[in-house]
A protein has these predicted regions:
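Bacterial N-terminal signal peptides
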Residues: 2-12
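Boundary at the C-terminal end of the N-terminal hydrophobic targeting segment
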Residues: 17-19
Length: 510
């Protein structure tokens, strides 16, 4: 059996090593070539090293090796208090197993002592490596049902090996609902690692979402997990299954057990990114997004929902409830703009947006939304007065100027509407911005009624310089206008206290 020397050397040549935390012992597991597994098991006074390849089956009493697949082998070395013993087992051509036994460096006869040594250590090998788990799970379940399997898992000290048995149990055995409930409670109670809990659950979530009892047990199980990262993996894998609408909603609601808004968002986004998605699902996501604390992540979910081509009116209006929970003016604006660009919005949505603007702190973002609303002719004509009144809440004359200028230049206003806008201009504090607006509208060839309103607004300007600038801009138009306009021009001009500035405008009509 020349493979023995090679095996000893191979124990030190491994890549893709991963550390496995044991409950009471140090265990490391590695792969050397994708097929060969090496396990080192250190328990203070003793050390066991195991290397194997292929499929290995043990006898029903777990005291010997029943068979090894062609080309496979198992090498076991145990060192205790300085004494080293080794066993190498390989398959013969007739299907039997050939054993080699060594004490120290000397090969010994395969006799009763060797068989007893193998019988003494083989159960530890089994429970340390997970070798032969499929056959053992089948054997225990056939003889004693679920309890027999779980009793054996209780004897395993490694989460890594425990999850192997539990996964096989879920994959291969015809578990009823009571058994699934029991497994759901057992897994987080007996496995410390969220990673391995996830390995058990992630491919079998559809079984747990089949009934109310199993769903409740499953949700209680993932609530006991500390890592939102691993909870999100389980839930996203569940969404990949062919679940009913009711089960899918349960998966979405299960995301509430996570504290992390990031991971909640990844779960909701997983579903929203699907090509086919019923209104019921979108509506549920929108409702759940109202509980996302982070404005950034809430906005991601809401904008994805708005991108859906079949968003129902109910879901769309539920978006407004979710937006009401967004504190950031930046993210509120992002969501509102996505709404306005997504579809023809209802009156309720427009009214909610206008109401929400009253609570915004940022003049910049309030201005962005108001300008978008005025860009929609249907909205601006119906809600002209309401939108114009929102300008009063803007503290910055700079942003008020942006809005009022846009209205005067781009809206098809009647004379009454024009007067209302100029009333807002007259109420501004800054003479500079008043003049900016009035000079721009004078360049737009206003009619006589509009020109009269402009001159009246100019009367609200305190600065002689700025007042004269507006009157100079109106000079050519006033000369060919009505007596009423000329009289208004003279009336405003006479309020200029500076002879210099008065002289610049008096010649326009004298």
């Amino acid at each position: 059996m020349g493979v023995a020397i090679a095996l000893i050397a191979m124990l030190s040549i491994t890549d893709n090593a991963q550390a496995q935390r044991s409950r009471s012992k140090s265990v490391s597991i590695s792969n050397s070539n994708g097929r060969t597994r090496t396990i080192s098991h250190n328990n203070g006074s003793q050390k066991m090293e195991i290397e194997y390849e292929g499929e290995i089956e043990f006898t029903d009493d777990d005291k010997s090796i029943k068979s090894i697949s062609r080309g496979g082998y198992i090498y076991i070395r145990k060192t205790q208090f300085g004494s080293r013993r080794e066993i190498i087992a390989e398959p013969n051509s007739d299907g039997s197993v050939e054993f080699e036994y060594k004490i120290g460096r000397k090969t010994q006869e395969w006799n009763q002592e060797a068989e007893e040594f193998l019988a003494d250590i083989i159960l530890e090998v089994i429970r340390t490596t997970g070798i032969g788990a499929e056959g053992r799970v089948e054997r225990f379940y056939s003889k004693g049902g679920l309890d027999a399997v779980l009793e054996e898992v209780d004897e395993i000290r490694s989460d890594y090996v425990s999850q192997i048995y539990l996964r096989i149990l879920l994959e291969d055995q015809p578990l009823d609902n009571k058994e699934l409930v029991k497994i759901a409670g057992y897994v987080p109670r007996n496995l410390d690692s969220d990673h391995y809990i996830t390995e058990v659950f992630k491919d079998h979530s559809e079984k747990f979402f089949a009934t109310d009892a199993t769903t409740e047990a499953f949700l209680e199980a993932i609530e006991r997990m500390d890592s939102d990262h691993y909870v999100s993996i389980i839930l996203k894998k569940a969404l990949d299954e062919d679940l009913s609408n009711a089960a899918t909603i349960k998966v979405l609601q299960a995301a509430e057990v996570m504290d992390s808004d990031h991971y909640k968002t990844t779960v909701f986004s997983e579903l929203l990114d699907r090509r086919e998605l019923q209104d019921e699902m979108i509506d549920e996501i929108v409702k759940l997004s109202a509980d996302i604390d982070s404005d950034h992540y809430a906005t991601i979910v809401l904008k994805k929902a708005l991108d859906r081509p079949n968003l129902s009116d109910k879901a769309f209006e539920n978006l407004m409830t979710a937006v009401a929970n967004i504190d950031s003016d930046h993210y509120t604006t992002e969501t509102f703009r996505a709404m306005l660009g997504a579809r023809e919005v209802s009156d309720k949505v427009v009214e909610t947006i206008i109401e929400k603007m009253d609570y915004m702190d940022s003049d910049h973002y309030r201005t962005v939304i108001i300008k978008d609303l005025f860009d929609d002719r249907g909205i601006s004509s119906k809600y002209f007065g309401d939108l114009l009144n929102t300008v009063e809440n803007i503290g910055s004359d700079h942003y008020s100027t942006e809005i009022l200028t846009q209205i005067l230049k781009e809206q098809d206003l009647d004379d009454a509407g024009y007067d209302k806008v100029l009333d807002k201009v007259a109420g501004m504090d800054s003479d500079h911005y008043k003049v900016t607006i009035l000079k721009r509208v004078l360049n737009g060839s206003p009619n006589n009624a509009q020109l009269l309103s402009i001159l009246k607004t100019a009367g609200s300007i305190g600065s002689d310089y700025y007042k004269s600038e507006v009157l100079k801009g109106a000079c050519d138009m006033v000369g060919d206008s009505t007596d009423e306009i000329k009289n208004e021009f003279r009336s405003v001009a006479k309020t200029i206290r500076s002879d210099t500035y008065y002289g610049r405008v008096a010649r326009c009509i004298d």
